[in-house]
Amino acid sequence: MIVTQDKALANVFRQMATGAFPPVVETFERNKTIFFPGDPAERVYFLLKGAVKLSRVYEAGEEITVALLRENSVFGVLSLLTGNKSDRFYHAVAFTPVELLSAPIEQVEQALKENPELSMLMLRGLSSRILQTEMMIETLAHRDMGSRLVSFLLILCRDFGVPCADGITIDLKLSHQAIAEAIGSTRVTVTRLLGDLREKKMISIHKKKITVHKPVTLSRQFT
């Protein structure tokens, strides 16, 4: 199985269909759990559509978002990195309705051994996720919720943004509740803060999609 730069990882997953346990397509509605911390790490996932939230759950019940995964992301790969069988470390939840491919971890491990180029593709994706996790940690370090919200919007611009005439549109339908859960706030607070940004012409919202006008100006003023 030769991996070329223009071949999506999704196609690589599908080419594993000749194995005894072929990849399967799964769908999850928003807020549905894909796996819990402590679940056996038996499969690797490839995100076809939508966005997935990875979070850590602590003993006090607090849940901290560490990453938002976009289409063409691979996740559930900790056992591949450590070389040891392990349980899930994160709570993976559908941030939007999602469609994904999953394959047994043994098959993915074999594919990585046979295809160094595939390993590089996955490594690039993991590097991007590490950067996003660092940015999320910085976001949650803000005590001021206004700064926290703006930092989160800028992360979404980076990872889900589509350039448009008015700025950058975040290509996700975001409810106020979903944003609140991601930044550790409340829906009421998020609604108020988004309203303030709209009044200042910093953002606009159409059909739950947020457009950020002049992201650089926004970052300088609020973060």
UniProtKB/Swiss-Prot annotation:
Q: Which residues bind DNA?
A: 176-195
**Cross-referenced PROSITE patterns:** CNMP_BINDING_3, HTH_CRP_1, HTH_CRP_2
Pfam family membership, one: HTH_Crp_2
- According to its record, what are the GO cellular component terms? cytosol
Q: Which UniProt keywords apply?
A: Activator, DNA-binding, Transcription, Transcription regulation
Residue stretches making up the HTH crp-type domain = 143-216
Query: Do you know which PANTHER family this protein is assigned to?
Result: CRP FAMILY TRANSCRIPTIONAL REGULATORY PROTEIN, REGULATORY PROTEIN CYSR HOMOLOG
For this entry, the protein name equals Global nitrogen regulator
Supply the gene name: ntcA
